Each structure stands twice: as C-alpha cells, then as structure tokens.
Amino acid sequence: MSQADISTCSAPQRVFQEAVKKGNTKELHSLLQNMTNCEFNVNSFGPEGQTALHQSVIDGNLELVKLLVKFGADIRLANREGWSALHIAAFGGHQDIVLYLITKAKYSSGAR
C-alpha cells in the first residue's frame, strides 16, 4: 500500500463524504479506485442522513450519480426522511437522473 493509500484509508468515510460534497467526478473516481484496499462502504450515511448517492442527486450531478452506481451505490436505499434517490431526483426536477435511475432499477431487478 502506498503512502497515499495509507492516508486515504485512515479516515475513508470522511474523505469520501468530503469528495462527494465537492462534486468533482475525476477526483472521486481516483479516490474510489484507491480505496479498494480500505474498509469502506459507498452506501454509508453521512451526518445529514444521506448517502453519497442521495447528495449527488440533490446536487443534480448525473456524472457523479453514474460513478457512484458503478462503484456499488444502492439506488434503493432511503435517506433519514424515507426518500430514495429516485424520489429526490423527481422532487428536485432532475429528469436526466430520474431516467437514469429508472433504467438502472429496471435492469438490476431483471425486469424486461
């Protein structure tokens, strides 16, 4: 493990949540690739009761949503208020994210 991996792994959830808040897809992609050796959960809830996916949907960041799903974010998880990523996207008027999440849900459930 490199020195960068060690510093990232020392507080992986905090580092991850901060990267999501920045919304920088390239930075987050690099971070996610480097955190594969860490005890790390892409579906963890932050202090506001949101997962990284929920936060990315709130921000309307489709690129980040796709990246998080690629790395295992569960689109079915509900936040503290009981809203899924799809609910948040629909309420926020993020039609591109709504369509993406519906498509992912359709294929992940095996529906045709």
UniProtKB/Swiss-Prot annotation:
The record ties this protein, via InterPro entries, to: Ankyrin_rpt (IPR002110), Ankyrin_rpt-contain_sf (IPR036770), PP1_Regulatory_Subunit (IPR051226)
Q: Which Pfam families match?
A: Ank_2 (PF12796)
The keyword Repeat is assigned to this record: yes
Span-the-membrane segments of this chain are: none
GO process terms (BP): blood vessel endothelial cell proliferation involved in sprouting angiogenesis; branching involved in blood vessel morphogenesis; neural crest cell migration; Notch signaling pathway; pigment cell differentiation; protein targeting to chloroplast; regulation of cell-cell adhesion; sprouting angiogenesis
Tell me the GO molecular function terms. Answer: chloroplast targeting sequence binding
Ordered alphabetically, the record's keywords are: ANK repeat, Developmental protein, Notch signaling pathway, Repeat, Transcription, Transcription regulation
Report each ANK repeat as a residue range. 48-77, 81-110
Keyword Transmembrane found: no
Known role:
Regulates independently canonical Wnt and Notch signaling by modulating LEF1 and Notch protein turnover. Stabilizes LEF1, a pivotal transcription factor in the Wnt signaling cascade, by blocking its ubiquitination. Involved in angiogenesis; involved in intersegmental vessel patterning during development.
- Family the entry assigns: Belongs to the NRARP family.
* Protein name, UniProt field: Notch-regulated ankyrin repeat-containing protein A
Q: Which organism is it from?
A: Danio rerio (Zebrafish)
